[in-house]
């Protein structure tokens, strides 16, 4: 096991210190420039569409898709998970406070990237036997014609199934088990079994039950955690300026706040900031497009605009509050790690109730992520093997949830980083190849062109020669 850990660590070092660090940020910067800072220009619209969707009762999810808000809720369910609590704490310990700054940077540019992901997922989604499916595998196949496209799409699907359904959900159950062991002294394995049974119940309900669960859990859990964190930060308001000083100084001159050698520590801050940021907001990873593909919208860019808000909520609100809780309460050097670190921060104000509060928040955060990631993995199972393999996949995921609750946390996180990174490579390559399609789609959207109309629940193609590149609608498997 030690050898496996070392090999995985070496590969992760190469991926996250060099390749993915520049590829993720570079792609985000490229789309930010090419789409003319779409994350800034369309922020107000995204805010309105997102929070307007909470107030309005949308369509019920079924085989023909979800409402725009249900799609976002399913995506945010995956985004807002252990990355916001345990992941933020891990980044702080491994990369110092400066890692939070690099999380912000990657998230800002990542908003442009995820706009492109959601737009392409909508454009290239398929309809088969009355069921809509979509995600990176479908647009990767379009980006690279012939066997190359099929091979890359298949690789992405394999990486996604392993990264989300297996190693990713092991991280979630591991964090739930850790939180409940700290709060109540319960054996993590017992917690894992209970979570697995509850998750299995949701899995068998299909997309309808998944959408129903996420649209109810996500707004409530996010609001409760935000309010609790704001109380902690408000109580320690005198430490807020120093917390931000540590974040900004730690990003460029960590020795000024007690860091190690400048070059190495800055590199670590960037590495763990980007890596944990990706694990948290998933921009560029290719996971959330599976949910955004199912949104019932008139134009693909409508969902692209909504998708950006998922990154904003995840990183700039929830993750930032977690970091401020840790930094303002002074528990950074307590020796705690993982979810135990924000638990220690809450304990300074709320006592044992704070420990229990984080355990409950972690349960809902991680459980919703398990549900969301299962759905993403299921989509890729169907892409590779069809519906016949879904039941086997569901049973395997349930087993890995139980297994993850009892494993050593370091190895679980390392495996998750590895397969998350492997997902990124084919996804970003396809995004770059199809960047012209994304830009033309945005141009038509801003020009007020409606490229999809719903007819009896089935979206029909409607395009002309001038806008053929941005024609959208479901395709059949035979196309």
Language-model region placement:
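Transmembrane helix-loop junctions in multi-pass membrane proteins
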Residues: 3-4, 34-39, 83-88, 164-176, ...
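N-terminal alpha-helical transmembrane segments of multi-pass membrane transport
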Residues: 1-78, 82, 93-98, 110, ...
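Helix-loop-helix module between adjacent transmembrane segments
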Residues: 31-32, 106-130, 137, 141-174, ...
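Flexible loop linkers connecting adjacent transmembrane helices
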Residues: 37-66, 90-100, 112-147, 332-349, ...
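Alpha-helical membrane segments and immediately flanking helix-loop junctions
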Residues: 56-93, 120-123, 129-137, 141-143, ...
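Membrane-interface loop-to-helix entry segments
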Residues: 23-30, 34-47, 156, 173-180, ...
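Extracellular/periplasmic helix-exit of transmembrane alpha-helices
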Residues: 115-123, 129, 230-246, 254-261, ...
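Selective recognition of specific alpha-helical transmembrane segments in multi-pass small-molecule
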Residues: 109-117, 193-207, 218-238, 271, ...
């Amino acid at each position: 096991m030690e050898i496996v850990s070392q090999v995985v660590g070496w590969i992760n070092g190469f991926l996250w210190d060099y390749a993915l660090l520049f590829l993720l940020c570079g792609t985000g910067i490229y789309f930010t420039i090419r789409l003319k800072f779409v994350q800034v220009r369309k922020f107000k619209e995204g805010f309105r569409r997102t929070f307007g969707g909470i107030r309005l009762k949308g369509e019920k999810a079924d085989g023909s898709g979800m409402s725009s808000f249900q799609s976002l809720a399913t995506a945010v369910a995956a985004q807002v998970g252990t990355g916001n609590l345990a992941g933020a704490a891990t980044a702080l310990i491994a990369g110092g406070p400066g890692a939070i700054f690099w999380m912000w940077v990657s998230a800002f540019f990542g908003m442009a990237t995820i706009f492109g992901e959601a737009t392409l997922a909508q454009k290239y989604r398929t309809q088969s036997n009355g069921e809509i499916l979509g995600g990176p595998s479908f647009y990767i196949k379009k980006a690279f014609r012939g066997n190359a496209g099929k091979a890359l799409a298949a690789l992405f699907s394999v990486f996604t199934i392993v990264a989300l359904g297996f190693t990713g959900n092991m991280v979630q159950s591991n964090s739930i088990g850790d939180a409940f062991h700290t709060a109540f002294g319960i054996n993590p394995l017992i917690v894992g079994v209970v979570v697995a049974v509850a998750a299995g119940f949701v899995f068998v309900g299909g997309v309808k039950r998944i959408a129903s669960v996420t649209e109810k859990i996500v707004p409530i859990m996010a609001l409760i955690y935000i309010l609790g964190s704001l109380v902690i930060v408000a109580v320690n308001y005198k430490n807020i300026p120093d917390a931000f000083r540590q974040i900004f100084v730690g990003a460029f001159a960590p020795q000024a706040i007690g860091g190690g050698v400048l070059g190495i520590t800055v590199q670590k801050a960037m590495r763990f900031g980007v890596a944990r940021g990706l694990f948290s907001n998933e921009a560029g990873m290719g996971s959330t497009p599976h949910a955004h593909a199912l949104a019932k919208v008139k134009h693909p860019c409508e969902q692209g605009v909504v998708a950006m808000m998922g990154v904003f909520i995840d990183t700039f609100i929830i993750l930032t509050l977690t970091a401020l809780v840790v930094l303002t309460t002074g528990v950074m050097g307590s020796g705690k790690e993982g979810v135990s670190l924000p638990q220690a921060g809450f304990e300074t104000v709320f006592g044992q109730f704070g420990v229990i509060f984080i355990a409950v928040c972690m349960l809902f955060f991680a459980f919703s992520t398990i549900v969301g990631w299962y759905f993403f993995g299921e989509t890729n199972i169907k892409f590779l093997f069809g519906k016949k393999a879904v039941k086997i996949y569901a049973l395997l995921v349930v087993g890995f949830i139980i297994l993850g609750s009892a494993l050593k946390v370091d190895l679980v996180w390392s495996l998750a980083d590895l397969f998350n990174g492997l997902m990124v490579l084919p996804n970003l390559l396809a995004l770059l190849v199809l960047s012209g399609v994304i830009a033309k789609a945005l141009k038509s959207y801003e020009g007020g062109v409606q490229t999809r109309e719903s007819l009896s629940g089935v979206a029909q193609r409607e395009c002309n020669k001038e806008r053929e590149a941005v024609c959208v609608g479901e395709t059949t498997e035979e196309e």
